[in-house]
A protein has these predicted regions:
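N-terminal amphipathic/basic-hydrophobic helices that include classical n-h-c signal peptides
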Residues: 1-21
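Basic, alpha-helical terminal appendages of large translation-related enzymes
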Residues: 17-30, 70, 74, 146-151, ...
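Short acidic alpha-helical/loop segments enriched in Asp/Glu that coordinate divalent cations
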Residues: 391-407, 428-437, 448-461
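Generic structural concept
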Residues: 378, 382, 412, 416, ...
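Long, amphipathic alpha-helical stalk/connector segments used for oligomerization, subunit docking
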Residues: 357-360, 364-368, 373, 388-402, ...
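N-terminal Rossmann-like or analogous alpha/beta NTP/dinucleotide-binding catalytic cores
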Residues: 20-144, 157
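Structured secondary-structure scaffolds
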Residues: 21-73, 125-129, 180-391, 436-438
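Short Cys/His-rich "knuckle" micro-motifs
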Residues: 163-166, 178-184
């Protein structure tokens, strides 16, 4: 299993019926994708897995499409909530962060998350970035010192208006809000209100899905009040430069990780020419509950810093259990690690991405999980790979028919149709639809094999042998496409398929999805004389409910 590390991804080559610039040594563009950084007050749950798998899938696809990709994830380690949790456990806040952030790294390793940096807000370069940005905004007059009096939700680390309270409780988490009064530095939101509205109007892809845009506009149109961005009532945070009785508000701190991660320090020193290219392409993956921070406060912070706001903020829904939000008190939190241990990482990745349309809430049900696993993965995909490998070994000694054997164009057209619309689907984060189309292709191929019944053909008869070889060639090349198509979503399964069929790895330079001619030459798809493995690993063993 691949263990992620701190690295720049290799630039990969693809010819998925799209133009690219690899012949000239150029790249197709830059792509920067981020997850939220996760609080270290507790171990990761399925919602953390969901956000991260979304980001990982599009990062993998963009790499395959010839983009220079940077994928950032990490942990949010400051704030009153962390300070209180550490006190309850009898440890220091840094000690708590050190122990819990490892659990996120372990989960991401188990899920085969291909991040380029795992950032911690306690990292030295991040602390410098936050203090540099704060100082710049103070010098520009976008930050000023005054006094804050109002409501605050500690679990959500957010300031609340009197109007937003629900019987004195936070409208987001339902817990009791507290009244606070203290000296504070403020960020001028009202100064940039019109500029933000103009940006939203002029960039239709800024907030996805589109219906979330109305929520943001409604909030902004009520009139933005300047935001308190420092606290004096606790100590666990980044000190305000020149005024260390204040610590910087956790959200101001956290949002700036997106600059730290791609080298803001070097950028302002004139040593990072890629910074602007990456940030112009940034896609933030966030939960719907933190959209306000990313679509309102963050763009205004960037306006004040002289940086263009994000290209896209993708706000996904929540995973519920029995229609209720997961919580420790209800005992309904789904542990992703236990699911991975039982079903494997790709089964969880597949379920999370195929079960709901991004932007909407989903209801996790273990019985439904098992049904989807057995029907889609074990029966449809697993059986297809197993039977195709078995037939090749039985009828051709494991040799994939070569260029002299044509494919069935009607079957391969299904793959072509999926490939031709792939870029737009990924840009819309329409993962459920992509997976639906992939599994429709899998079912088409299974039906083709069943209807053709190659096991009834006599390989000693020249005419029947020709038909048989065409079926086997069509199946093998189709599985090549399937392996490519599922790679961003189910990388471990794709690699297993490539191992069985001796396919060139997709995460190495120089691979191609299809030759330009319809009848693919075996050597351009497969390697080492086009001979597959003698034994095909069972990809997804069936699961019984009583297990």
């Amino acid at each position: 299993m691949r263990r992620p590390g701190k690295r720049r991804p290799e630039l990969l080559r693809t010819t998925v019926m799209r133009n690219n610039n690899y012949g000239s040594g150029k790249i197709n563009g830059y792509f920067y994708v981020t997850t939220p950084i996760y609080y270290v007050n507790d171990k990761p749950h399925i919602g953390h897995a969901y956000s991260t798998v979304i980001a990982d899938s599009i990062a993998r696809f963009k790499r395959l499409s010839g983009y220079s990709v940077f994928f950032l994830t990490g942990t949010d380690e400051h704030g009153l909530k962390i300070e209180k949790e550490a006190d309850l456990r009898g440890v220091t806040p840094k000690g708590l962060a050190d122990s819990v952030h490892i659990k996120f790294k372990e989960l991401f390793s188990e899920l085969n998350i291909s991040y380029d940096r795992f950032i911690r807000t306690t990292d030295a370069d991040h602390i410098r970035t936050v203090q540099t940005a704060f100082k710049k905004l103070l010098e520009n007059g976008d930050v000023y010192l005054s006094e804050y009096e109002g409501w605050y939700c500690t679990p959500c680390e957010t300031f609340l208006t009197e109007k937003s309270l629900m019987e004195g409780k936070c409208p987001q988490c339902g817990r009791q809000a507290v009244k606070v009064k203290e000296e504070s530095y403020f960020l001028k939101l009202d100064k940039y209100e019109k500029k933000l509205l103009d940006y939203i109007a002029g960039n239709p892809g800024f907030i996805k899905p589109d219906f979330r845009k109305n929520e943001v506009l409604s909030f902004v149109n009520e009139g933005l009040k300047n935001l308190s961005i420092s606290r004096t009532s606790f100590k666990w945070g980044i000190p305000v430069p020149g005024d260390d009785k204040h610590v910087i508000y956790v959200w101001f701190d956290a949002l700036l990780n997106y600059l730290t991660g791609i080298g803001y320090e070097d950028f302002i020193a004139g040593k990072n020419p890629d910074f602007t290219q990456f940030f112009k392409s940034v896609n933030h993956i966030v939960g719907k509950d933190i959209l306000k921070f990313h679509a309102v406060y963050w763009p205004i912070m960037l306006f004040a810093l002289g940086i263009e706001p994000p290209k896209t903020i993708m706000a996904h829904g929540w995973w519920l259990t029995d229609g209720r939000k997961m919580s420790k008190s209800l005992g309904n939190v789904v542990d992703p690690v236990s699911l991975i241990n039982k079903f494997g990482p790709d089964a969880l990745r597949y379920y999370l991405l195929s079960e709901i349309t991004l932007g909407l809430d989903g209801d996790f049900n273990i019985d439904n999980f098992v049904v989807r696993y057995n029907s889609g993965l074990a029966n449809d995909l697993g059986n297809l790979v197993s039977r195709t490998a078995a037939m090749l070994n039985k009828y051709t000694g494991g040799a994939v028919p070569g260029a002299d054997v044509p494919e069935d164009a009607a079957v391969l057209k299904t793959a072509d149709d999926i490939l031709s619309g792939l870029d737009a689907r990924y840009d819309d984060y329409d993962f459920a639809k992509i997976l639906e189309d992939i599994f429709r292709f899998i079912n088409t191929l299974n039906k083709y094999i069943n209807d053709s019944a190659p096991w009834k053909l006599n390989i000693e008869d020249p005419e029947e042998k020709t038909v048989l070889l065409k079926i086997l060639k069509t199946a093998a090349v189709s599985i090549y496409h399937i392996s490519y198509l599922i790679y961003p979503f189910m990388p471990e399964t794709s690699k297993k398929i490539n191992g069985i069929f001796n396919i060139k790895p997709f995460d190495s330079a120089g691979f191609s999805v299809r030759p330009e001619d319809t009848a693919a030459h075996c050597g351009e798809l497969f390697k080492d004389g086009c001979r597959i493995s003698e034994k095909a690993e069972i990809l997804f063993p069936r699961i019984k409910f009583e297990e």
